A protein has these predicted regions:
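Extracytoplasmic gating/loop element in the C-terminal half of outer-membrane beta-barrel translocons
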Residues: 98, 351-354, 405-503, 519
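Outer-membrane beta-barrel transmembrane domain signature of Gram-negative proteins
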Residues: 1-86, 141, 178, 373-375, ...
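Surface-exposed loop/turn segments flanking beta-strands in extracellular/periplasmic regions
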Residues: 1, 31-62, 153-178, 227-234, ...
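Surface-exposed extracellular loop regions of Gram-negative outer-membrane beta-barrel proteins
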Residues: 1-12, 16, 70-102, 106-121, ...
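Conserved small/polar residues in nucleotide/adenosyl-binding loops
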Residues: 547-551
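Conserved small-residue
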Residues: 34-36, 41, 256-377, 503
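Outer-membrane beta-barrel signature, preferentially recognizing the C-terminal barrel domain
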Residues: 53-74, 164-205, 234-257, 300-307, ...
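Transmembrane beta-strands of outer-membrane beta-barrel pores
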Residues: 23-29, 64, 93-99, 119-121, ...
Length: 551
């Protein structure tokens, strides 16, 4: 990576000017050659080429060769002007060219501007409130770009194979992948307003921000007809827009009393995500594990909203009697005209039994079909928050960090496996309190044990799998001791600190899974899907920091 910049700084009375122009170039290459082989005469030989004279005895197991490169070129400029430490204006502009896009839309233009007003430096403020507090107002707008795609999404490749022509097989070439040569930058326009407030000579500070961003020209794998040779093409959804808006606040405080010092910081954030427009295309239905449709992206809703059937409790033995009466009147999968349903709706496949999950018949036709699927929730929390604190008394210090989330939901797809009760694997402890009979219904939240029908009825993706993922977590706590300086000077040591630390000490949550913070293969269109990834580890550390004196 290379960066070349030219700076200018000037001060003229109450005016200050800072300017920068620059050029950056970065390139990343990936070159891999991997070979596996068997048949070496000695386990201590680690080189494939070190086979000795009997090369024919070595069996090449597999080989893999990959090579890729990515380049970004940027031109940038920034001007910052301030007057009398009260008013600040900053303008920036940059243009970026990415090799990940085709020549038609390779370059993106990204300007921004920000304004600041330090009200506490105004005479009227100081006359009214004095010098014990500070207040600054901020506002900004900027345009940013996203090129987070593969390296060659704009370049089609050719495939080769045999083609029978007459009595001979000829070599044939065809377009193996379909690409959009005009693919370009995804862009986000964002407005921000905020304030910085300091009280009691800086002992208490409050920061507040409001933001509103609109992303457009969204990068997306657009499904296409397989006749093209590909199932999808990476492209920009030209008229699609997604909005994120929210507020965040942070308060910092410090207490200094003799040998006792205490710093504490707390923050809270609220974000709302909404698909404004999908650019005229239909709803995006996304498939996750076991080829199950679990999410939908739809105009007016958050990205990747949960989608499935609505569970309405557990079917009782009385319900089952009514179902059998109803089912005997089915004609070609439909009820006769004027027929009044007595029991729960009948699924469109497989029989149901007492103890199975009862599904809501959304369209009121007496049958449970794909048309009965509804929006079940989403993975976005009502708010997130964090607390960090730092105590010190003489040479001892205690630091702790806490994080939390309230109102988020998760599709706990582990229930598909951990509630199957087929004897093929471990189960959640809550299955001990499952439904057995109307006289012993258990907790009312776990369906019956079954061997074959359960996966086809009770384990379809539904609100039954949607769990509250709110949590409060101690992310880290550290206790330390700093040895007195006068002791260390005697052994030519500048400073010595011993500490013990624990990461992920505890998590308070009602979520049954390993971790309420989940991610499905990094796919932003499938948020909040828990398929049983490795749990978050708890780490214990003991260490020391030693600073030696200069010679």
């Amino acid at each position: 990576m290379g960066e070349f910049t030219l700076n200018y700084n000037g001060e003229f009375g109450k005016h200050r000017l800072n300017a920068l122009v620059g050029y950056t170039l970065q390139k990343k290459t990936y070159d891999r050659v991997a070979v596996e082989a068997t048949g070496f005469p000695d386990d201590r030989i680690h080189e494939v080429t070190a086979h000795g004279p009997n090369a024919s005895d070595i069996g090449l197991y597999s080989s893999d060769t990959r090579k890729a490169a990515w380049t970004m070129m940027s031109y940038l400029a920034r001007v910052n002007y301030s007057f009398d430490n009260r008013y600040v204006v900053t303008g920036t502009v940059r243009t970026d060219g990415s090799s990940r896009f085709g020549k038609e839309n390779r370059w993106g233009w990204f300007p921004s501007i920000s304004l600041g007003w330090t009200i506490s430096n105004e005479k009227f403020y100081q006359d009214l409130l004095g010098n014990n507090s500070s207040l600054k107002l901020r506002a900004s707008w900027g345009l940013s770009g996203n090129n987070n795609i593969g390296n060659y999404e704009h370049t089609a490749t050719m495939s080769q194979g045999g083609y029978v022509y007459g009595n001979t097989v000829e070599t044939a070439y065809w377009q193996g992948t379909f690409k959009d040569a005009a693919i370009g930058w995804e862009k986000t326009s964002q407005y921000n307003v905020g304030f910085d407030l300091g009280l009691f000579n800086g002992r208490v500070n409050l920061i507040g921000n409001y933001y509103n961003s609109l992303s457009y020209d969204l990068l997306y794998d657009q499904p296409i007809s397989s006749i093209s040779g590909s199932s999808s093409v990476k492209t920009n959804l030209k008229n699609a827009k997604v909005r994120n808006s929210g507020v965040d606040f942070q308060i910092d405080g410090r207490i200094l009393t003799g040998d006792f010092k205490w710093n504490v910081s707390a923050n809270i954030s609220v974000n709302r995500n909404k698909v404004v427009d999908l650019g005229g295309i239909n709803d995006l239905y996304l498939v996750s594990e076991r080829n199950v449709v679990s999410h939908v992206t739809r105009s007016g809703l958050p990205i990747g909203s949960f989608y499935g059937y609505i569970a309405d409790g557990i079917i009782s033995e009385k319900d089952y009697t009514n179902i059998m009466i109803d089912k005997s009147n089915l004609v070609n999968g439909k009820f006769p005209d004027g027929y009044q349903l007595i029991g729960p709706a009948v699924p469109n496949y497989n029989n149901i039994h007492p103890g199975d999950v009862k599904w809501r018949d959304v369209d009121k036709n007496g049958l449970i079909t794909e048309n009965d699927r509804e929006i079940l929730g989403n993975a976005y929390p009502d708010f997130t928050y964090g607390i960090s604190t730092d105590f010190s008394y003489k040479n001892f210090d205690l630091r702790a960090t806490f994080t939390g989330s309230q109102g988020a939901e998760v599709i706990n797809f582990q229930k598909y496996y951990l509630y199957n009760m087929e004897g093929s694997g471990n189960q959640l402890a809550s299955v001990l309190n499952r439904w057995h009979s109307d006289e012993n219904p258990g907790s009312g939240g776990v369906f019956r044990a079954a061997r074959s029908s359960t996966p086809n009825t009770s384990q379809r993706l539904s609100s039954y799998m949607v769990d509250d993922a709110s949590y409060f977590r101690c992310a880290n706590i550290t206790l330390g001791y700093n040895f007195p300086v006068k002791w260390m000077q005697k052994v030519s040591v500048q400073a010595l600190r011993l500490y013990v630390s624990v990461d992920n000490l505890f998590t308070l949550t009602d979520y049954e899974g390993y971790n309420p913070e989940v991610d499905y293969k990094g796919n932003n269109l499938l948020p909040g899907f828990d398929w049983g990834v490795y749990p978050l580890a708890r780490t214990y550390s003991i260490g020391c920091l030693l600073y030696t004196s200069d010679a």
